[in-house]
A protein has these predicted regions:
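Bacterial N-terminal signal peptides
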Residues: 2-9
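N-terminal, post-signal peptide beta-strand-biased segments of exported outer-membrane/organellar beta-barrel
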Residues: 10-127, 419, 445
Length: 505
């Protein structure tokens, strides 16, 4: 049970969708930036930067992002939790924050050339904490409530009907990217770009499952589960040694108690991951009096972590945690990205923007070799964007935009520590030009997530654990009778604030 908890949690956290296109406050104001000609183009439309006025341009941005990740899990054995008020449905909520997200964009535009620099969290970043674990954690421990009555039937006064557990998970992940490139204006209407991004990815995961307790004799007092099961196993072994004729009756019980004793031991996992990667980037831009059209392609960034872990012995001995053993190699590639954008200027001062993004998630390797999670996806993520910007006067401009993101999620891919759902995001903000050299931007971005519903006849592989303790036939019967069915409803919240300044020399 301990292994199932941390195995599910950390395997999930190691891989995920790395699709951060928010690298400038201009994105918060209007996410449809794929054909815009501004300093944010150093990331979103680098070929278009050639059409900025000559000089040195520098952008400094600070953002703050806050998320919640909510999973409403339904599983009948949850009702046996001492702190669950006899309810089989439970809300598991994690909080994630990145209070300071810096980014820097710079461009030197001279004649037909624009030499560019970008530093940002290209694959996202921040920290997440789950103070009460997740459904994948607790569902494994909740199975004790199904085992207790059988033990009571076999040994009067030795059973139980309630459990307690201390489950915790904390993770940090940052993917820093530095991009150098240059664009060349072929003529007054067309420009091209080539660049190279270097990525440094770092992650740390800490989790524990400990103090699993049961109420021996169905009473109000709780005792450590592992020690209790070990004591019963030792007692039964003594009886069996004295009376070998009882082997057919006692041997299965000895096996069950031994398995339960091992499964309920404390498990602690402490893993660090680091790696570098590189990706070429190419782009093109077409400009006319009333319309701009742009495209960009970022190649896949291969990230291969090699774990530096200090796990408990109980964790290192568990095959389900193989991906987090010291020295294990885990992939966490940043997928290739193709973007298209159009900007239309129907009247003076008004800019309308359309964009499309396609992430090649299915080709980006994620997880332990031989069990890559990306292979569970249907295709790649798609994003559709629309936005508008209007100049109120020579100093003030206002903007807003919307982004629709559709992920190729499948039931096999979705789990409660590495999930995201389809979403609609709204951004708005203002820009204020202090003078010809200084411009200030401020924006707010809010994401509204859909709910993804997942049902399972064998919730979090719960029957597999019963099978280890009571045999394959017992596990099969549980699935057939619906005793281990369950469901999850996944959703999230996300909000980002940001301010930035652009300097032109």
């Amino acid at each position: 049970m301990s292994v199932a908890l941390l195995g599910a949690a950390l395997t999930a956290t190691a891989g995920g969708y790395l699709t951060n296109t928010n690298q400038n406050v201009a994105f918060l104001r209007n996410p449809a930036q794929d054909a815009a000609i501004n300093l944010n183009g150093v990331y979103s439309n680098p070929a278009g930067v050639s059409f900025l006025k000559e000089g040195f341009h520098l952008g400094l941005n600070l953002q703050s992002a806050y998320q919640t990740r909510e999973v409403t899990s339904k599983f009948a054995p949850f009702a046996d939790g001492a702190n669950n008020n006899n309810r089989d449905t439970k809300l598991f909520k994690g909080t994630a924050s990145a209070p300071i997200i810096p980014s820097v964009q710079a461009a030197w535009v001279k004649n037909r050339w624009a030499f560019q620099f970008n530093f940002a969290l290209v694959g996202g970043g921040g920290k997440a904490e789950f103070n009460q674990g997740m459904g994948s954690f607790e569902s494994q421990v909740a199975l004790l409530g199904m085992v207790g009555p059988k033990i009571e039937a076999d040994h009067k006064g030795s059973g139980f009907n309630k459990y307690k557990v201390d489950a915790y998970m904390h993770g940090k992940q940052y993917v820093f990217g530095t991009t150098l490139g240059a664009s060349f204006r072929v003529n007054d209407h067309f420009s091209v770009y080539g660049g190279l991004r270097g990525v440094y990815a770092t992650a740390h995961y800490y989790g524990h499952l400990k103090n699993i307790q049961i109420n021996q004799g169905n009473g109000a007092n709780f005792v450590p589960a592992s020690g209790y099961f070990g004591f019963v196993a030792t007692t039964l072994k003594g009886v069996l040694a004295a009376k070998p004729t009882l082997a057919s009756a006692l041997a299965p019980q000895v096996r069950q108690m031994t398995v339960l004793s091992e499964a309920t031991k404390d498990v602690t996992l402490n893993a660090d991951q680091h790696d570098f990667g590189f990706a070429p980037i190419v782009g093109a831009h077409f400009r006319s009096k009333y319309i701009d059209v742009a495209a960009k392609y970022e190649f896949r960034t291969a990230i291969a972590f090699k774990n530096e872990s200090a796990n408990s012995e109980s964790a290192n001995n568990l095959s389900a945690l193989a991906a987090y053993r010291d020295g294990a190699e885990v992939r966490s590639d940043i997928p290739a990205l193709l973007t298209f954008g159009v900007q239309v200027r129907p009247v003076e001062g008004l800019r309308l923007n359309l964009g499309y993004h396609h992430y090649f998630d299915k080709q980006a390797k994620s997880g332990l070799k031989g069990a890559y999670r990306n292979e569970l996806l249907n295709a790649g993520t798609k994003e559709y964007l629309f936005g508008a910007e209007y100049d109120l006067n020579k100093s003030w401009e206002v903007s807003a935009g919307v982004q629709r993101t559709e992920y190729p999620n499948t039931d096999a891919y979705m789990n409660d520590l590495s999930f995201t759902t389809n979403s609609t995001s709204l951004g708005l903000g203002v820009g204020y030009r202090v003078n010809d050299m200084v411009k200030v931007n401020a924006g707010y971005f809010h994401t509204f997530y859909d709910t993804y519903h997942k049902e399972s006849a064998n919730y979090n592989n719960a029957a597999n654990l019963i099978g280890a303790a009571q045999g394959a036939e017992a596990a099969k019967a549980l699935v057939q009778h619906g005793a281990v069915k369950g469901s999850d409803d996944f959703t999230r919240t996300n909000k980002v604030f940001g301010v930035g300044v652009e300097l032109t020399f």
